[in-house]
Curated annotation (Swiss-Prot):
The keyword Coiled coil does not apply. This is UDP-N-acetylglucosamine--N-acetylmuramyl-(pentapeptide) pyrophosphoryl-undecaprenol N-acetylglucosamine transferase. GO terms for biological process: carbohydrate metabolic process; cell division; cell wall organization; lipid glycosylation; peptidoglycan biosynthetic process; regulation of cell shape. Cell wall formation. Catalyzes the transfer of a GlcNAc subunit on undecaprenyl-pyrophosphoryl-MurNAc-pentapeptide (lipid intermediate I) to form undecaprenyl-pyrophosphoryl-MurNAc-(pentapeptide)GlcNAc (lipid intermediate II). It comes from the Bacteria. GO terms for molecular function: UDP-N-acetyl-D-glucosamine:N-acetylmuramoyl-L-alanyl-D-glutamyl-meso-2,6-diaminopimelyl-D-alanyl-D-alanine-diphosphoundecaprenol 4-beta-N-acetylglucosaminlytransferase activity; undecaprenyldiphospho-muramoylpentapeptide beta-N-acetylglucosaminyltransferase activity. The gene is murG. InterPro entries: GlcNAc_MurG, Glyco_trans_28_C, GlycoTrans_28_N. Its EC number is 2.4.1.227. Keywords: Cell cycle, Cell division, Cell inner membrane, Cell membrane, Cell shape, Cell wall biogenesis/degradation, Glycosyltransferase, Membrane, Peptidoglycan synthesis, Transferase. Belongs to the glycosyltransferase 28 family. MurG subfamily. It comes from Helicobacter pylori (strain G27).
Amino acid sequence: MKFALTGGGTGGHLSIAKALAIELEKQGIEAIYLGSTYGQDREWFENSPLFSERYFFNTQGVVNKSFFKKIGSLFLQAKAAFKAKEILKNHQITHTISVGGFSAGPASFASLLNKIPLYIHEQNAIKGSLNRYLSPKAKAVFSSYAFKDKGNHVLTSYPVQNAFFDCARTRTEIKHILFLGGSQGAKAINEFALLNAPKLTKQGIKITHICGSSAHERMRFFYQELGLLDKVELFAFHNNIIEVMHRADLCVSRAGASSVWELCANGLPTIFIPYPFASNNHQYYNVLEFEKENLCYVVPQNELLPKKLFEVIRKLNQKDDQGNKNLTTISTKLQQKIAKDGAKTIIETILNA
């Protein structure tokens, strides 16, 4: 028995691949990885001991491109698919798991050509174009969101690494705020952090700001101009996001699915600013259920005024009918919403199929 994991591009997809790879390793099952040279796949897995072999194809996405660029991207995908077909055959792969993203294309299609059972994890509440096409052809589609077209869909807990649960805690007071722009940074969140930093630090609230590598020097300059560089923990990227989340009492974040569920597992109340240009507005739908259950605050990017942060802080400090702070109630309920061992459930479901 040997698995192939494929897909990625961004940290959200790749964190799922990592969680599944860790579970396969625990169960003593060998796995290889197939991704792309474009995006973050190499950064995550080029030297990862979780995989016996790693392959990166020269591929790019097709969505939101001009006609001729789409043709070029499809040609690269097709070329890579035939390479992937040989790789899967040579490794005698028995199961393929796609975590989505454009880099999942070649190995997913190669698996279908080789008649290898294909399993898909759909991380978002709205399916991406590749998963929409491949879902009917897959053995099963795992997701933490309920889809209307149930078919071969399996509802599971999100495959969050156990460390996020292990470092969870119930928040009782807002002493530390984390501004989290995602793996690629977020200009709107960066500016929101800068505008609120003077008042927050004046009130004695600590700030950790992960701004993305492209904005790091600029953010450093602005904090220095504000005289706050020594009062703000500023990072382009942080290797231990679990520890950073654990220390925070409130988070401001995009609404990529992996971030949403990791914050949930950690019990960290969050203000979500969905990326407005995400395909099919999927980031908004990722947190819609949370918002309906009063487990988060959602602020559209075009309404992101500095006063919004303090409005939310004020609401979180108010007490509910039982005399508990809303902050504490939300933190407690978040930890109850997601079950541990989502990755284990997915792997065992596949093995028992």
